[in-house]
């Protein structure tokens, strides 16, 4: 393969960081194409644990080029905090190993302020934002009032853009929400400092990535969040502000669709989501609590407890269709060891009709009753399994059901957080 995508097939938190790290071993380039520092990836290498938010997971290898694409919204403060964190763990970050799109939009202090103010104003209709300014930054991008990285590193352009934009933002903050105005000089001086630190990393990434593909290099596109958080195909409005599906790669990294050869959907062996919104297979009982504790289901970025439920094959089938997935990588199947019986959702009953897709309307999704098929569980710990044949027979049946229902093969199975707790069972 030459260019392939790794993306979340559920509501995020599926283990994309680990899978990207695993697959990056054979890649030359790793590209983040959307989202911002609202994403959280945990990668375990040996005895070390790394928590990443902005920087691609390929940074943990010494010989990979890592790319932050134009579809990402970049918080310079968060970026340099992450760089310092990684360097403290012995990871070298240089312009030879990390490049940033000159077209990426910059998260400004007023984005974070407005994110928090608007969320509080929603009251009990809050959408569960991380408060990091992601949504407001994408809003400015679409309103054509955003500041891009190429603007930030040109002093005169940045000065003019900041003056115009801050005047409007301060009116919104003070006159509509009753907040305190932000100081122009304080922001200007802070971000000029970031501009100089960013400058060596800034490139036209579309030119570089396409040349790598043309030269036959292996390019891995790393998604953040998940399919059901996509701005168009997710459970709107409880979604993120970017395109998390395969189509987002073309926009967020400047490559054409014909360049993509494979798309791998990462899916937990059960389902989780953070925040509000319908969740047909949610477990609101002791089983849900058990899965949450055993699976350590707490957000990397927010620390929030994740809602847990049975595996929903309707969601996986929807993800496979929308992104043209060529295979699934199933993670955390080890978490399910010890349950006598497992349930898998194979359809929804909505207004007397059985459907096998996720409806657009939240009201309809909230009415959906899951139709379950039961499977016998397995008692054995499978954390030491290193090939398909090491898995219990019931675990293999469980994986086969995923393949049969979604008409998409399972190519990778993960049985723990470490690199070596991963088995490739077929080509992706």
UniProtKB/Swiss-Prot annotation:
Q: Give the InterPro entries listed for this entry.
A: Adenylosuccin_syn_GTP-bd, Adenylosuccin_syn_Lys_AS, Adenylosuccinate_synth_dom1, Adenylosuccinate_synth_dom2, Adenylosuccinate_synth_dom3, Adenylosuccinate_synthetase, P-loop_NTPase
Give me the Gene Ontology terms describing cellular component: cytoplasm
Enzyme class label: ligase
What are the alphabetically sorted keywords of the record? Cytoplasm, GTP-binding, Ligase, Magnesium, Metal-binding, Nucleotide-binding, Purine biosynthesis
The keyword Heme is annotated on this UniProt entry: no
Q: Which PROSITE patterns match?
A: ADENYLOSUCCIN_SYN_1 (PS01266), ADENYLOSUCCIN_SYN_2 (PS00513)
Positions with a binding annotation for Mg(2+) = 13, 40
Determine if Cytoplasm is one of this entry's keywords.
yes
- Give the residues the record marks as binding GTP: 12-18, 40-42, 306, 332-334, 414-416
On cofactor binding, the record's note says:
Binds 1 Mg(2+) ion per subunit.
EC numbers on record: 6.3.4.4
Record: residues binding IMP: 13-16, 38-41, 130, 144, 225, 240, 304
Q: Which family does it belong to?
A: Belongs to the adenylosuccinate synthetase family.
Kindly state the subunit structure of this protein.
Homodimer.
Protein name in UniProt: Adenylosuccinate synthetase
Q: Which organism is it from?
A: Clostridium botulinum (strain Hall / ATCC 3502 / NCTC 13319 / Type A)
Gene name of this polypeptide: purA
């Amino acid at each position: 393969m030459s260019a392939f995508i790794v993306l979340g097939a559920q509501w995020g938190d599926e283990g994309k960081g680990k899978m990207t790290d695993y697959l990056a071993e054979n890649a030359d380039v790793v590209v983040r194409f959307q989202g911002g520092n609202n994403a959280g990836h945990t990668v375990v290498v040996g005895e070390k644990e790394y928590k990443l938010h902005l920087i691609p997971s390929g940074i943990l290898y010494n010989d990979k080029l890592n790319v932050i694409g134009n579809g990402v919204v970049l918080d310079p403060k968060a970026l340099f905090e992450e760089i310092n964190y990684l360097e403290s763990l012995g990871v070298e970050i240089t312009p030879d190993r990390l490049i940033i799109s000159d077209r990426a939009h910059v998260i400004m202090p007023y984005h974070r302020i407005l994110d928090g103010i608007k969320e509080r104003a929603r009251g009990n209709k809050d959408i569960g934002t991380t408060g990091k300014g992601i949504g407001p930054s994408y809003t400015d991008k679409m309103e054509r009032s955003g500041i891009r990285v190429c603007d930030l590193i040109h002093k005169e352009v940045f000065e003019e853009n900041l003056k115009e934009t801050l005047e409007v933002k301060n009116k919104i903050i003070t006159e509509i929400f009753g907040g305190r105005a932000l100081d122009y000089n304080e922001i200007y001086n802070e971000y000029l400092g970031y501009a100089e630190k960013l400058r060596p990393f800034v490139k036209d990434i579309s030119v570089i990535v396409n040349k790598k593909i043309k030269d036959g290099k292996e390019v891995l596109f790393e998604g953040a969040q998940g399919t059901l958080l996509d701005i168009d195909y997710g459970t709107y409005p409880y979604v993120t502000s970017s395109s998390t599906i395969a189509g987002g790669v073309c926009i967020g990294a400047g490559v054409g669709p014909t360049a993509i050869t494979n798309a791998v959907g990462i899916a937990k062996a059960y389902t989780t989501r953070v925040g509000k919104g319908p969740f047909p297979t949610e477990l609101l009982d002791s089983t849900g609590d058990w899965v949450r504790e055993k699976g350590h289901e707490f957000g990397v970025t927010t620390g929030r407890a994740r809602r847990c439920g049975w595996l929903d094959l309707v969601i996986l089938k929807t993800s496979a269709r929308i992104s043209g997935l060529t295979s699934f990588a199933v993670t955390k199947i080890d978490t399910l060891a010890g349950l006598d019986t497992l349930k898998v959702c194979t359809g929804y009953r909505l207004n007397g009709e059985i459907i096998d897709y996720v409806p657009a309307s939240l009201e309809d999704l909230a009415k959906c009753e899951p139709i379950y098929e039961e499977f016998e569980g397995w008692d054995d710990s499978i954390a030491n399994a290193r090939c398909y044949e090491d898995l219990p027979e019931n675990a293999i049946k469980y994986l086969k059901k995923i393949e049969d229902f979604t008409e998409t093969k399972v190519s990778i199975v993960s049985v723990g957080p470490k690199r070596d707790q991963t088995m490739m069972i077929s080509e992706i």
